[in-house]
């Protein structure tokens, strides 16, 4: 696999999620954390939004981070000027490329949109800026027109082109083909930006990488517009564990990072969320728990410590004797097989009644109720 660069946009697209507002202090904390764990590039915001946004971007720019920082801009000269005022050395310029987007934003005048793009790239380059261009709604654009825009952007001085599945309508197979077309035609790197409207943001990001894209947009916990974006933790771990490529990210801190962003955004991370959900390494099923106790590889794709978790055995409706005895032995309680079965029966009954698994305290109380205190050592 080609070398892949993570360009995380939690501070831009992530904050565009409905109902999410980061304070300046939260933005600084998130930027520092992303930089600390080794994320090489951050899209830090939209200077044209106004003074408050500019203050946050300036604060991040003044941190002296190792990561490269970009500001997001429309194809408007005043946007570029605002980015320069924030101390940005890199800018991303977005331009609509689909018929539906050009009709809505430029009244169908695609020549006007291209001239705007050319003028903005020229202005940015004259300012000494590194320029990336993004084709907004690339996934629904005419492929020939999209390719023309990308080639023009390259000719006019862009150093990277972003393929955007803006409304998340692609599958991995189509993504591969569309990105491959750009990669084959351009000499500048291609970046993929995917959305999760059909639950395929991470899969589409990986497909774009397989097609030759050398940069990928992510957000922590998949935070973003509508159904969100490709999740940083999912992309990083998939590349590391499925493709065998270590991107230099400090993965044991991914859980801590996700908790920081979840708290700042007010987002509730589902327990079943890949990589960072609290049930990712929790086992209740008797067959699974027994297997994991014998060899964790039986039911885990990688060690929980690799992303900051610890393995957790849960007792409930689906538990078996091995889970119960293992948890009790951790608390110095050793039961014979008949006693263990009796406790297990009680666990299952209580779990059904409560419609959830039992806490450790509830399990220990069941043992007391069964009057097996003699088993404690």
Swiss-Prot record:
All residue ranges annotated as the Pyruvate carboxyltransferase domain in the record: 4-255
Cysteine disulfide partners in this protein: none
Biological processes annotated in GO: biosynthetic process; carboxylic acid metabolic process; nitrogen fixation
Keywords in alphabetical order: Nitrogen fixation, Transferase
Catalyzed reactions per annotation: acetyl-CoA + 2-oxoglutarate + H2O = (2R)-homocitrate + CoA + H(+)
Broad EC category: transferase
Gene3D superfamilies: 1.10.238.260, Aldolase class I
Keyword Transferase found: yes
PROSITE patterns registered for this protein in UniProt: AIPM_HOMOCIT_SYNTH_1, AIPM_HOMOCIT_SYNTH_2, PYR_CT
EC number: 2.3.3.14
Record-level Gene Ontology MF annotations: homocitrate synthase activity
SUPFAM superfamilies, sorted: Aldolase
The protein's role, per its UniProt record: This protein is a Fe-Mo-cofactor biosynthetic component.
Alphabetized NCBIfam families for the sequence: nifV_homocitr
Family: Belongs to the alpha-IPM synthase/homocitrate synthase family.
Descriptive protein name: Homocitrate synthase 1
């Amino acid at each position: 696999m080609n070398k892949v660069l993570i360009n995380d946009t939690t501070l831009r697209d992530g904050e565009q999620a409905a109902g999410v507002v980061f304070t300046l202090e939260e933005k600084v904390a998130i930027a520092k954390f992303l930089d600390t764990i080794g994320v090489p590039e951050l899209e830090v915001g939209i200077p044209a939004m106004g003074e408050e946004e500019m203050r946050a971007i300036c604060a991040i720019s003044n941190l002296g981070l190792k990561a490269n920082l970009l500001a997001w801009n429309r194809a408007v000269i005043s946007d570029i000027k605002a980015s320069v005022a924030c101390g940005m050395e890199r800018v991303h310029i977005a331009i609509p490329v689909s018929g539906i987007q050009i009709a809505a934003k430029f009244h169908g005048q695609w020549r006007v949109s291209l001239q705007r793009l050319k003028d903005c790239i020229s202005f940015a380059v004259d300012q000494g800026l590194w320029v990336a261009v993004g084709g907004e709604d690339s996934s629904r654009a005419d492929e020939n027109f999209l390719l023309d825009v990308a080639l023009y952007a390259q000719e006019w001085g862009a150093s990277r082109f972003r393929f955007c599945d803006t409304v998340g309508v692609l599958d991995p197979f189509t993504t591969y083909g569309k990105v491959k077309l750009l990669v084959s035609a351009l000499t500048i790197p291609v970046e993929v930006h995917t959305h999760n409207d059909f639950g395929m943001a991470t899969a589409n990001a990986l497909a774009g990488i397989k097609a030759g894209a050398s940069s990928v947009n992510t957000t922590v916990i998949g935070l973003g517009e509508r159904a969100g974006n490709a999740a940083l933790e999912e992309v990083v771990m998939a590349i590391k564990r499925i493709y065998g490529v270590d991107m230099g990210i400090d993965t044991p801190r991914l859980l801590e990072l996700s908790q920081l962003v979840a708290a700042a955004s007010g987002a509730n991370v589902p327990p079943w969320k890949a990589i960072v959900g609290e049930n990712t390494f929790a086992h209740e099923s008797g067959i699974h728990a027994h297997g994991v106790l014998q060899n964790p590889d039986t039911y885990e794709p990688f060690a929980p410590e690799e992303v900051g978790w610890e393995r957790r055995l849960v007792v409930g409706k689906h538990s078996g004797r091995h889970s119960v005895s293992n948890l009790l032995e951790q608390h110095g309680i050793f039961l014979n097989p008949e006693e263990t079965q009796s406790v297990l029966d009680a666990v299952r009954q209580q779990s059904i009644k409560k419609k959830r698994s039992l806490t450790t305290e509830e399990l220990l109380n069941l043992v007391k109720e069964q009057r097996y205190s003699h088993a404690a050592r």
